[in-house]
Amino acid sequence: MDLDLQGQVALVTGGGRGIGRNIALELAAAGARVAVAARSRAEIEKTAQEINGPAIECDVSDRVSVEHMVKLVESELGPIDLLVANAGISIDEDVAWEIDPADWWRVFEVNVLGVYLCCRAVIPGMLERGAGRIVNVASGAAYLPGSESTAYSASKAAVHRFSETLANQLEPHGIPVFSISPGLVRTRMTDSNDDLPWTPPELAPRLVRALASGRLDRLVGRYLHAEHDDVDDLAVRADEIVENDLNAIRLRR
């Protein structure tokens, strides 16, 4: 299937740096018109200039801010075909009981409530048109043993479960929802970890581009890992993955 995204409108939150920036650049290179959003306009201006798209200030944990963001994108670019809910934060955490509860909860406000609010804001338009796709960026920290941050890992597990349940609700309407792990990509959030097996930064954008194209729609609701799941292999094995309930977080007995 052609991975050309000509004519599509995409919104990428957290699009000013790291994974979100790379995704925005990939989508724009594939022909999509892309808007990027972040809390600080200065953080996204460079990316917006490179993709010739709008840069929108938005606090994804604030409903009014999110709804305003979506209206701006729709007024400047048109109806949103693809949401990439990428904005996320982490905190330094040695032990959970020494963290300020407000700081701990803020991770959930951005990483979970933010994803929900962004989805909630774009879904009515997608339902009206009977088309659209949603990609929520989660993390392998949701299921890997030894995850060091209770706030971050728990929030990303919530994103996975939210995405799968939302996918079940939207599949009858023809709107696929996916959650992805971009792998361990060197970003400002992870840069303090020097001796880790970094994931090539181009893999997550490549996966999102394939999802945006519709090539992997059979895998609606699945959890896809940018490093461990090859796009071509996913397309070939899609029926097997669904029939055997693979690429899902389950309690196996």
Roles of regions detected by a PLM:
Residues 9, 16-17:
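Conserved glycine-rich cofactor-binding loop
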Residues 119, 155:
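Active-site helix of classical SDR
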Residues 67, 90-105, 128, 148-151:
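Conserved mid-core segment of classical short-chain dehydrogenase/reductases
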Residues 139:
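Residue(s) in the substrate-gating loop at a strand-loop-helix junction
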Residues 124, 168-172:
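Alpha-helical segment proximal to the catalytic Tyr-Lys
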Residues 97-116, 131, 135, 159:
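Catalytic Tyr-X3-Lys loop
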